[in-house]
Amino acid sequence: MRLLRITAGLGRGPLPRVPAILGWQGKQANWKTYRWCSSGSIPNEKIRNIGISAHIDSGKTTLTERVLYYTGRIATMHEVKGKDGVGAVMDSMELERQRGITIQSAATYTMWRDVNINIIDTPGHVDFTIEVERALRVLDGAVLVLCAVGGVQCQTMTVSRQMKRYNVPFLTFINKLDRMGSNPARALQQMRSKLNHNAAFVQIPIGLEGDFKGIIDLIEERAIYFDGDFGQIVRYDEIPADLRAAAADHRQELIECVANSDEQLGELFLEEKIPSVSDLKLAIRRATLSRSFTPVFLGSALKNKGVQPLLDAVLEFLPNPSEVQNYALLNQNDSKEKNKILMNPKRDDSHPFVGLAFKLEAGRFGQLTYVRNYQGELKKGSTIYNTRTGKKVRVQRLVRMHADMMEDVEEVYAGDICALFGIDCASGDTFTNKDNSDLSMESIHVPDPVISVAMKPSNKNDLEKFSKGIARFTREDPTFKVHFDTESKETIVSGMGELHLEIYAQRMEREYGCPCITGKPKVAFRETVTAPVPFDFTHKKQSGGAGQYGKVIGVLEPLAPEDYTKLEFSDETFGANVPKQFVPAVEKGFLDACEKGPLSGHKLSGLRFVLQDGAHHMVDSNEISFIRAGEGALKQALASATLCIIEPIMSVEVIAPNEFQGAVFAGINRRHGVITGQDGIEDYFTLYADVPLNNMFGYSTELRSCTEGKGEYTMEYNRYQPCSPSTQEELVNKYLEATGQLPVKKGKAKN
């Protein structure tokens, strides 16, 4: 009871003393410590910026909730899905608490052993991948959470690729060791085979499933138990006798894996010397920071086991802001390597301020902009510049975020994550002070949307609310795209999946009081050519007075399959036949004409327009002439080309009980899926397949019915590839019917 009274008081005013078990080793602690953590006197060594990311339902939010509790940031723990009527702190949106999923990245900060930790909890659904991209772009390190039962899953691979793209060092935490069928050894094996990671256990479990009692620390060679009602008392003991041999073997394996990627430990290993605990810890840190080794930790967040050692590992093995190299680009036309400028992580005002807006949110007091500070100092009341728009803005209010609660601060320094109010900007914008307004941070990678639906308000009187909501959502989320189809007179919204668009339709109703009607999902088909086609096109227009004249000669080429979503323009002209000032006009004409293909009306992609020669007229040639010439050249080339329709292919992962294996395989085959792999544990099997997105609609209902509700699946975009002849014929006929070039079949309504 005494302990409960202490923890219940956390977060409300000064505390006389906080016990060592909560992360402070018997030091005086005050809640206001959190308010001091932005000050310049806090060195970089005392700061960590980390993200927690994983596949859906691996336990990221539950883990974050435990971290906040053990570090004294929250007084009581709550469960995901609001089982206790409250819901997790980090799931602040009502929809998140209802569904038990994380939709937006929530930012918080806490303290562990005198080190300030900024944490971003990210979604696991592939539909919300942009949130993970944004988080990893601005973090220095991450914790990748795996489920001990599911192991490496679809989204785990996506997150791993994203971490590689942004060069983020990370630890792995295998969660849910208390679940039936948990197998951490299998999860480790999958990390090595599927993700190609040089990974090894730093801990091994004492028991599994219902017998999971604690963990063995292989570095310090001791057993760790978690006592007390909430696992808050960490107790160290000797390794149980029956596990000593296994612990020795795993420790040797750990040393070998680290020695393979760290030179200093490798030398000790070759000399057959036994490394000391500090030697091993330093080697693991060096190898983790260089991304050549992944340490693997174990536990069960729900059962309050293994969280405190993971926090210690974050401090020991993940980098502080001064150990990460962040670059800004000079805003020049040729942004090559030489134009990259290294940011200085010093926590003072000796260098100009540079920050990146990585997330936007509509808060209670206007737009909230999350900013990662890379260099210099940002003060409340100071003036900063948006390098994209060139506009200057005043920082009226500077806050630190704890999920949806905020705390005002006077200044932040390099390495801090903060939020600004009332600043008009877009995600990925760079802010600087006047001294260096030609700098910008590298922009965040934004994947293309793969699915579209028509959306309109149920009530025509709600059009104003609808447009307000759409404007806000597109500003906050770059993967949520909107355009107006002039032919069907419909507003088309595009996103990363059915769930993504469904969530926005629900948010429109909840947050703007505007119920929406959504149409049938439409897949983002594309058209491309199968072989190079030459063109030689002249645009001439004489109507008295100044006319128009532009001639272009070149070739239209298909791109490689991995570039099917791109459009490229190549200027290979010599001399002044096509004046250089008109080349961008030719490119504009080409890109404009790619908006609609001749075969099925879908966009053209996977093309390279190579401009080789042409001609101009001294008087009649102008920009519009060459725009029309570019458009005409593309149409001329397409008229003699062999076109094909390409479609998005999804990587699908299905998990279901073994008795339904036949039905699941048959279902995937019916949807023209190509099975790429399979594995199984206990009574469940996992099927991996590549399936056209067009064939995946309604699959969740089919899977539920054929597995008695026990099967589940996830999918993510993989690539574009040519669709089947039958699908192509169907799409072409549908387009011809819609445009009146083909009579509509009897009994079939126009689409």
Curated annotation (Swiss-Prot):
Gene Ontology, cellular component aspect: mitochondrion
UniProt pathway annotation: Protein biosynthesis; polypeptide chain elongation
Keyword Secreted in record: no
Residues annotated as transit peptide in the record: 1-37
Gene Ontology terms: biological process: mitochondrial translational elongation
Positions with a binding annotation for GTP: 54-61, 121-125, 175-178
Tissues of expression: Detected in all tissues with the highest level in liver, thymus and brain.
Subcellular localization: Mitochondrion
N6-acetyllysine carried by residues: 176
SMART domains given in the database record: EFG_C, EFG_IV
tr-type G domain mapped to chain residues: 45-322
Any Pfam family: GTP_EFTU_D2
Catalysed reaction equations from the record: GTP + H2O = GDP + phosphate + H(+)
Residues modified as Phosphoserine: 92
Sorted UniProt keywords: Acetylation, Elongation factor, GTP-binding, Hydrolase, Mitochondrion, Nucleotide-binding, Phosphoprotein, Protein biosynthesis, Transit peptide
PROSITE patterns noted in UniProt: G_TR_1, G_TR_2
One example GO MF annotation: GTP binding
EC number(s) recorded for this UniProt protein: 3.6.5.-
Family designation: Belongs to the TRAFAC class translation factor GTPase superfamily. Classic translation factor GTPase family. EF-G/EF-2 subfamily.
Function: Mitochondrial GTPase that catalyzes the GTP-dependent ribosomal translocation step during translation elongation. During this step, the ribosome changes from the pre-translocational (PRE) to the post-translocational (POST) state as the newly formed A-site-bound peptidyl-tRNA and P-site-bound deacylated tRNA move to the P and E sites, respectively. Catalyzes the coordinated movement of the two tRNA molecules, the mRNA and conformational changes in the ribosome. Does not mediate the disassembly of ribosomes from messenger RNA at the termination of mitochondrial protein biosynthesis.
Official protein name in the record: Elongation factor G, mitochondrial
Protein's gene: Gfm1
